[in-house]
């Protein structure tokens, strides 16, 4: 039994708490799970209004493309009677590879493509110039591993559909992405003359995988059985968020409400939350599996990924051999784009733009 006893002081826990605050301030972000952006009601209403306009316009265009009138859109693109490719850049930083893309676009006719940029408004970026000038669409905040990336892609699709009825393919491009071929090579690949002559339906180039070791955890990231009845586990798919969709599939994406109600829900398990890699493959696999190739045209290297990010290429790795290697695939087609490149790769890439990248 102690000889002396001291009364408990209320100052001790108070002092302990005060001393702990600086520690929590500095270590908290590394201990607590990061907060994910959610879809706000105003943003949802803005998107629905945009989608409805694009859907109404698409459904009113039942005539063959050759009967479409020549029009000038609010983004300044002039419609002609040849199908176009809509290049949709999704970025939260400067477009570091704009000079390389400028060469890509300047080597072809301007009436064969349109450019759209979704730039996170919370981040200040340099105003794009050249063919990219005035191409930023009304944008919202985005965050990796959140439904905001799905919203941004849908926003780009709807804007491009509304802007020009001759946008026939819609390619989603990252700011870390580079072209691997010339524009004319890509255009010839997508609008194959044999398909045109036979009046065949075009296919969407989107990766759709049904097997993955992490698929179950990602399916239940919002809670067990939350995805049902809209999406059962055997319908859940995964794939690259960067795709090249046909117009009919772009329409299906912006028409969807059923699956979106589930994919926009916040995740409980944020470590397994990558909705942007599941929404599009799952939706199109359920809606039109035969209309999709199930592979992407964007090459990415996952051999030494870090925190869910693919391998990043740096200047010492950039060479003609790398470009040739990145083009190769396991199928009969060639990859058209590649990521992820660090901004300082621009100079070595520009040095071999004409002699390697755009020499088909």
Positions of PLM-derived features:
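ER/Golgi luminal nucleotide-sugar-dependent glycosyltransferases, focusing on the catalytic module
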Residues: 1-360
